[in-house]
Every structure is written in structure tokens, then in C-alpha cells.
Amino acid sequence: MRSRVAVRACHKVCRCLLSGFGGRVDAGQPELLTERSSPKGGHVKSHAELEGNGEHPEAPGSGEGSEALLEICQRRHFLSGSKQQLSRDSLLSGCHPGFGPLGVELRKNLAAEWWTSVVVFREQVFPVDALHHKPGPLLPGDSAFRLVSAETLREILQDKELSKEQLVAFLENVLKTSGKLRENLLHGALEHYVNCLDLVNKRLPYGLAQIGVCFHPVFDTKQIRNGVKSIGEKTEASLVWFTPPRTSNQWLDFWLRHRLQWWRKFAMSPSNFSSSDCQDEEGRKGNKLYYNFPWGKELIETLWNLGDHELLHMYPGNVSKLHGRDGRKNVVPCVLSVNGDLDRGMLAYLYDSFQLTENSFTRKKNLHRKVLKLHPCLAPIKVALDVGRGPTLELRQVCQGLFNELLENGISVWPGYLETMQSSLEQLYSKYDEMSILFTVLVTETTLENGLIHLRSRDTTMKEMMHISKLKDFLIKYISSAKNV
């Protein structure tokens, strides 16, 4: 039988471990634990640590404009959850209910543009994939969350025959054998390095790209000192570039220019994206890219020249298998990590695109037109189809044919013609402006007579007549032109 001292000690150990739980323990369900110790030995710092994820100091309020934007993002389904669940800190840390249908589409478009820019139109960059979680050794300072069966944990904690030392040993063994959730995409790419080196005939430089969800602890120092409040999620876009040491700094400069230019390309106010030099505790150089939100700058992407340390740490022993060709020389490459947060990037573009302008539909000067002027390549929906005056059945059939034609050509469409509730044109345009829909097409009885449709622009609010046969080519040319700017 354990003494009271041992019982109190065991409870203390359990409280320390359980402070890393991501939720309530239910029978048979995986729970999440995190180890938080002082770094020792050969532990390689994760990019979550290098970037300082999980901590967002309070900043001054962002004003009425931010509240209006948040309300639109909820009402138009860019974001899910209540106002209380969508605080600034929760959005920045990835601890919110998630994105709505339009938010998912916006992030998908942003990811597609990143992929096109970094992978599709670039030589020697290859896609890779890695597991979200896998077993791994329990290292000092390892802060990764681990998946643990609640039933296994409950059996250990309820065994009253265990001494304090046995209880601690059992819990540590559970952590060692459990799978840990990935905090970044870097190590998944490094695992592919040797195999992909053969793919390029050992010629440097080359890169490995991946987009995926990563997890990080979010700390609540107000309630529990060094305690974990919840698990943050973010969608990362990662390029790991393997380059000869002699050209590593030039490549870092190249990727910095490329990434900053890319972020600015889709912005209404490009100057809100900026960069700064940085250096980690080991003296490794890098750059950080920021977006200037109403409350201040927030990190959206990091670039690091990590040297050869990560590769040598992952592949100890035979260094020759790491050698790539730099001309006639065999060298261990430097690792450049280019790591962007697409969720924060999406939030940045929502703030960048939000505009309050005078409402041309009303004489009341205190009422403003609220519009999200997202870049044409990023806008979740390109065109809305609605019906005006005329025989409803015939007009809907025309809209359905147009809907299918546009979808077949990769143009996303909102089927407003299916709506049964009557709305004025003012209400329709306001709704579609808030959804960031580029164009509204109105099919009327005139369309049945001579093929002419009404086309209204989100950005200019101008309306024009166009023949229905020209709409597809017009939209394709418009989006293509915006992509090439």
C-alpha cells in the first residue's frame, strides 16, 4: 500500500502530465499529451519554437472596421463559430471552430497559387508527403503532443498497487511508445532527402514541397503556469531547398524576394507585407515575413538557412550518402526552410480586401457598402447567376445551362437562381459583395428574346449588357489577366 506522501507525489506527477491534455478523457478515445522539459542534449528545435508559436501578446483593439469584417466573415461563412470563439488570439493561434465553406474555398485557392508558384512552374522541386503522427523517441525538451489511449491511461492511474516510481515509469513508457503529432513539415521532407537525391542524379540544388496541417501547443499562463490550454492547428506550406553551402546565402536572398513578391501580388495594399532579418540562438540566419494587421504586425512566413545540422542529425553515421554534386565536388548540402502559414495568410487577405464605401443605393450617408475585394485568383466564387423578370422555369433552365458551362471551364459559380425567397437587387448585390463574388449575372426575359444578360462588377459596381455566348470567354480572360499581373 502506498503512503500518503507517495499518493500526493503521484497526484503531482499526474497533474503535470495531464496539463497537456487536449480535452476530456473518454473511454477508448485518443488523448493528447505534451512533454515540456528544459532543452538538453541533441534536441533539434522545431520551427514552432523558432517562430514563437502559441503566444500572442495583447494588442490594442482594432476598431469598428475589424468588428464589421468579423461579422461579415461569420454571416457569409468564411469563418465558423460564435463571436466569442473568434477572438483575435484564437484566430492567430489556430484555436477556433474552423472555416466555413467560403473560407475553405479561399484557403484552397491560396494553396493552389502557392503550389503553382513554388512547384508547378519551377525546375527541380518535387512534391512529398508525410504522416501526421508517428512513433518517436521521447527527447528532453520535446514539446510535441502525443496520442495516448484514454483507456490505457485510466488503467494505469487506477492501479492502486503501483508505487510512485512504478507509476512514473509506466507513464513515461506510454509516452515513448505513443505517436506524436507533427509540429512542422521540415522533418517529413528531410526523411525523403536521400531517396529524392537519386531522382535528381545527386545534382544540387533541388527542393521538396508539401502542404499540410501541423499542431502546436497554445499556453495559458493566466490559469496554469507553464500549462497547456489547447492545441492549435495551422495549414503550412513548406519548401525545403537543398543547396550547396557556397550558394546558400544567395538562395536565401532569392527565396526571400520571391516570397515577399508573391504575398504582395494578391494584395490591395502590398506595402502591408514586409520582411525583417532574424537569427536563432545558434547563430543561423533567416528572414521573417509579416502582415500589418490593424493591431500590429503578425508573422505569416519564415525562411531559415539551417546549414547541414538537421541532415547530419537525422542521418548519423554514413555521411557519404548525404553527398550531392556541386559541379565536380561532393558536398553535404545546406538546408533552407521556407515555411508559410496559409491560415494566417488567408486572414491577412480578408483584412486587406475589406472596404467600406458609400452605398450608392441609399441616400443615407451613414450607411456604407461593405465589400471584400479579394484578388480574382483568390475569390472563392467568381460569378453569381440570378434570374430577373420573366418566366421562372425558362430562366432557370438558361441559368442551369450557363452554370454547367462555366463549371466545366473551371469557373466557380453561385446558383442564386435556386433561391426561393425574393430579394431586391440592392440586397443581392450587398450579399454578393460581402461574399467577394466578382460578377453578378442577371438572366431576364430579354435574354430569352435576344440572348443579352445583365453583368454587374463587384469592384466598379458598373453594369453592362453582354451576349450570353461571350460570358465564358470574358470571365476566363479576366481571371487569366489578373493572374498574370
UniProtKB/Swiss-Prot annotation:
Q: Which Cys pairs are S-S linked?
A: none
Quote the subcellular location field of this record.
Answer: Mitochondrion; Mitochondrion matrix, Mitochondrion nucleoid
List, in alphabetical order, the GO biological process terms annotated in this UniProt record.
DNA-templated DNA replication; in utero embryonic development; mitochondrial DNA replication; positive regulation of DNA-directed DNA polymerase activity
Which positions does the record annotate as the modified residue Phosphoserine? S38
Q: Which residues form a coiled coil?
A: none
Residue spans of biased composition, Basic and acidic residues class: 46-58
KW Kinase (keyword) present? no
- Which keywords does UniProt give here? Disease variant, DNA replication, DNA-binding, Mitochondrion, Mitochondrion nucleoid, Phosphoprotein, Primary mitochondrial disease, Progressive external ophthalmoplegia, Transit peptide
What changing D433Y does, per the record, is:
In MTDPS16B; decreased DNA polymerase processivity factor activity; results in decreased stability; affects the secondary structure as shown by circular dichroism spectroscopy
One Pfam family matching this protein: HGTP_anticodon
Tell me the segments the record calls region Disordered: 28-65
A Gene Ontology molecular function term of the record: DNA polymerase processivity factor activity
**Matching Gene3D superfamilies:** Anticodon-binding domain (3.40.50.800), Bira Bifunctional Protein, Domain 2 (3.30.930.10)
Instruction: Please indicate if the UniProt record lists Mitochondrion as a keyword.
Output: yes
Record text on subunit structure and interactions: Heterotrimer composed of a catalytic subunit and a homodimer of accessory subunits (POLG:POLG2).
Q: Which disease is it linked to?
A: Progressive external ophthalmoplegia with mitochondrial DNA deletions, autosomal dominant, 4: A disorder characterized by progressive weakness of ocular muscles and levator muscle of the upper eyelid. In a minority of cases, it is associated with skeletal myopathy, which predominantly involves axial or proximal muscles and which causes abnormal fatigability and even permanent muscle weakness. Ragged-red fibers and atrophy are found on muscle biopsy. A large proportion of chronic ophthalmoplegias are associated with other symptoms, leading to a multisystemic pattern of this disease.
Q: What is this protein called?
A: DNA polymerase subunit gamma-2
Q: Which organism is it from?
A: Homo sapiens
Q: What is the lineage of its organism?
A: Eukaryota, Metazoa, Chordata, Craniata, Vertebrata
